[in-house]
Swiss-Prot record:
Aspartyl-tRNA synthetase with relaxed tRNA specificity since it is able to aspartylate not only its cognate tRNA(Asp) but also tRNA(Asn). Reaction proceeds in two steps: L-aspartate is first activated by ATP to form Asp-AMP and then transferred to the acceptor end of tRNA(Asp/Asn). This is Aspartate--tRNA(Asp/Asn) ligase. It comes from Methylorubrum extorquens (strain CM4 / NCIMB 13688) (Methylobacterium extorquens). The record marks 33, 83 as: Important for tRNA non-discrimination. It catalyses: tRNA(Asx) + L-aspartate + ATP = L-aspartyl-tRNA(Asx) + AMP + diphosphate. It is found in: Cytoplasm. InterPro entries: Aa-tRNA-synt_II (IPR004364), aa-tRNA-synth_II (IPR006195), aa-tRNA-synth_II/BPL/LPL (IPR045864), Asp-tRNA-ligase_1 (IPR004524), Asp-tRNA-ligase_1_N (IPR047089), Asp/Asn-tRNA-synth_IIb (IPR002312), AspRS_core (IPR047090), GAD-like_sf (IPR004115). Belongs to the class-II aminoacyl-tRNA synthetase family. Type 1 subfamily. Its main location: cytoplasm. CDD domains: AspRS_core, EcAspRS_like_N. ATP binds at residues 221-223, 496, 548-551.
């Protein structure tokens, strides 16, 4: 017999009745029924009920056991008495009568009980993460994460991709967030950086003549935590392809994500064909560049309607005269809501920094659509009808309005759309709704610096005739601001899973792109000289994307916080409470690295 086990705690079945088995695991729960002890023994694979009474020679040893002690038991499998079965457990029809028990690892008083669903402060959970991970839900999340990563790898290989490993110690990159720096002992005063992403390496892999790259890549960014973003470290499915168009990337990536989500969605529907939504349409119709398509509400522009001379609502008139816009957010079925529903939405809008949300409630009177509400009296019936038509509103619906600069109106309307959809329970949450957002603007006007600047990714290829692009001058600012980039995002349920792009592989086009944004060739050479040199030595057209693994797992585990799907996460202050990181270095370590500390004064 094996030293520790013949079976796992999830493997015992009725077919094993009568056999002598050996199990090892943790005491999940112990129940004393007066001379009879029931020990629920748990391991990675499941749980088996074990029972012992005073007739057993191991009874005294069993009496000493406590929650989370690690024990080994030998015993006979028997059928549970009628009426005591547990249909929720695969082992629920049998139990093991204990003949022998050995304590393998006693446990002290637990700072975090494993049995039960009691919530504990995050600080406690992270400090004792190894205990937290014994809890069923979190344990299942981590196992599901591993299965999802396996599925991603398998699907990528089936798609003709080859897995590469890129360096972890590299040079500091000027784009994105702050770098994590690693001092060099051999080169005093110089530092490596942990990669924010393997962006340049994966492009160099294409320039090196490889064709289809992927990597489950660790990425390191010194940035603040959010619910959907871990501080410090995260993983992404990094992808790059040579000789491809934007559509080729979509055709390669879409089946991978759709397949993984269908495999792990737990019965939820998954979008079959991911719709393409332009950035302009996303901002207009959804108020955000990562639309949640589970919500059926679509925002409409009603600036022209409120600009009509017959409309007397001065608040919106003033906004329009100053160059602003008015957006309409439909609220399906809201006419039947009490006044408090509308008052709460206005209070919420004021908490967002807006003066409020004007609204019209539409009802049918005499066979015609009639608008009521605080601002309806300022708007003629004919224009109300136009507003209702644009917003897709019918009798029994309401329409809310957001006014301001285009950016502010879009932002408020987008948030209101989500809030209204949630309040009215309009969203179909039994699905994973995907889309591609495409045609991002290459440039935008920087009002603060009064100059043209990059809008999103400066290294994406402009969707513009090359010769015409190279000929652009200072007088072409209107044309420049209209240039779109071959850049795309993939969005699921309102969460951005990834950004990607067809790369700018032409040095002359890249130099011109940066020159338009006010960066001289010397700046480009200084910061990206290595990449430019490679591009000058025969670079293929290439493009890629990098969906976030942590966010994919978070969605599929239906967790609101990314720390629930990471094995050993940091807290929001980028601290590892369990291992005590970051930690002070010893004077000897600092001397070896030629580093002297110059710390800020502690605040009183």
């Amino acid at each position: 017999m094996h030293r520790y086990r013949t079976h796992t705690c999830g493997a015992i079945r009725p077919s094993d009745v009568g056999q002598t088995v050996r199990l090892s695991g943790w005491c999940h729960r112990i129940r004393d029924h007066g001379g009879v002890l029931f020990i629920d023994l748990r391991d990675h694979y499941g749980l088996t009920q074990c029972v012992i009474d005073s007739d057993s020679k191991a009874f005294k040893a069993a009496e000493t056991a406590r929650s989370e002690w690690v024990i080994r038991i030998d015993g006979r499998v028997r059928t549970r008495p009628a009426g005591t079965e547990n249909a929720e457990l695969p082992t629920g029809s049998v139990e093991v009568y204990i003949d022998d028990l050995e304590v393998l690892g006693p446990a002290g008083e637990l700072p975090l009980p494993v049995f039960g669903d009691q919530e504990y402060p995050e600080e406690t959970r992270l400090k004792y993460r190894f205990l937290d991970l014994r809890r069923e839900k979190l344990h299942a999340n981590i196992m599901k994460r591993g299965a999802i990563v396996d599925s991603l790898r398998r699907r990528m290989r089936e798609g003709g991709f080859f897995e590469f490993q890129t360096p972890i110690l590299t040079a500091s990159s000027p784009e994105g967030a702050r770098d994590y720096l690693v001092p060099s002992r051999v080169h005093p005063g110089k530092f490596y950086a942990l990669p924010q992403a393997p962006q340049q390496f994966k492009q160099l892999t294409m320039i090196a003549g490889f064709d289809r790259y992927f990597q489950i890549a660790p990425c390191f960014r010194d940035e603040d935590a959010r619910a959907d973003r871990s501080p410090g470290e995260f993983y992404q499915l990094d992808i790059e392809m040579s000789f491809v168009t934007q559509e080729d990337v979509f055709q390669a990536v879409e089946p991978v994500l759709r397949g993984v989500f269908e495999e792990f969605a737990g019965g939820k529907r998954v979008t079959k064909e991911f719709p393409r939504i332009t950035y302009a349409d996303a901002m207009l119709k959804y108020g955000v560049d990562k639309p949640d398509l589970r919500n059926p509400l679509i925002i409409a522009d009603v600036t022209d309607e409120f600009a009509d001379d017959a409309v007397e609502f001065k608040a919106f008139k003033g906004v329009i005269k100053s160059g602003g816009v008015v957006r309409a957010i439909p609220a399906t079925g809201a006419a039947g809501q009490p006044r408090s529903f509308f008052d709460k939405l206005n209070d919420w809008a004021r908490s967002e920094g807006a003066p409020g949300l004007g609204y019209i409630v539409f009802e049918e009177e005499g066979g015609a659509l009639t608008g009521k509400g605080p601002i309806a009296k300022f708007i003629p019936a004919a224009i109300q009808a136009r507003i209702a038509e644009k917003a897709g509103a019918k009798a029994g619906d309401a329409v809310f309005f957001a006014a301001g600069t285009e950016a502010k109106a879009a932002g408020l309307a987008g948030k209101a759309r989500i809030r209204i959809g949630d309040e009215l329970k309009l969203s179909d949450t039994d699905q994973f709704a995907f889309c591609w957002v495409v045609d991002f603007p290459m440039y935008e006007w920087n009002e603060e610096d009064k100059k043209i600047d990059f809008s999103h990714n400066p290294f994406s290829m402009p969707n513009f005739d090359r010769d015409e692009f190279l000929a652009l001058g200072e007088a072409d600012s209107e044309k420049i601001l209209g240039i779109k980039a071959f850049q795309y995002d993939i969005v699921c349920n309102g969460i951005e899973l990834s950004s990607g792009a067809i790369r700018n592989h032409r040095p002359d086009v890249m130099e011109k792109a940066f020159a338009i944004a006010g960066y001289g060739r010397d700046v480009l050479e200084e910061k990206f000289g290595g990449m430019l040199n490679a591009l000058r030595l025969g670079a293929p057209p290439h493009g890629g994307i990098a969906p976030g693994v942590d966010r994919i797992v978070m969605l599929l585990c239906e967790e609101p916080n990314i720390r629930e799907v990471v094995l050993f996460p940091m807290n929001q202050r980028a601290e590892d409470l369990m291992m005590g990181a970051p930690a002070e270095a010893t004077p000897k370590q600092l001397r070896e690295l030629h580093i002297r500390l110059n710390l800020p004064e502690k605040k009183a």
